[in-house]
Amino acid sequence: MKDRRQLYNDFLKAFPVESLKNMTLEQYTDLKKDNSFCYWIEAKTSELGSIWGGCSYKFGVYEYQKRPKINDSRVISDEKYAWYSKYHKVTVQEAYDVVREAIIKIALYAQQGKWNEIEEISELGHSYKWKIAFMYSSELLVPIYKKEMLEQLALHFGMDNPAAKTM
């Protein structure tokens, strides 16, 4: 088991915030490599809070092994990638630009402790967005990304109606 702090630092070395604006689609999602941003967030750093499960839609844009069903209105796909139709983008690169901008905002807001601004970002899945925030927060966030789990924890420690609270 790798030291968690070392793992955290290894991620930041691989994806420093200043490099995000130049992160290519292939660096973001690549099924053949274990060094893509998505792979790091979901798999390599799972000891820093898991976001396993669910579908790949959480990444906004992803390279697929099996093409999504044509009748799934949530997703648009080409011969290699799929992305959310809610982005209203025709090409994967246009969709990826939306995703990359959201990641940059999340990372910068996390460094500044702007948690409410992160909560307002809707381009990415909830758990995925908060895992990214944790990874750029200087470990100021709790590495639990499922809102329901955080609410249960808050109840346990005596907070009244945590579901009604904001970050």
For each feature predicted by the language model, list its residue ranges:
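Short hydrophobic alpha-helical segments that form membrane-spanning helices or hydrophobic packing faces
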Residues: 129-135
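An N-terminal alpha-helical hairpin/helix-loop-helix interaction module that forms a charged
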Residues: 1-126, 137-167
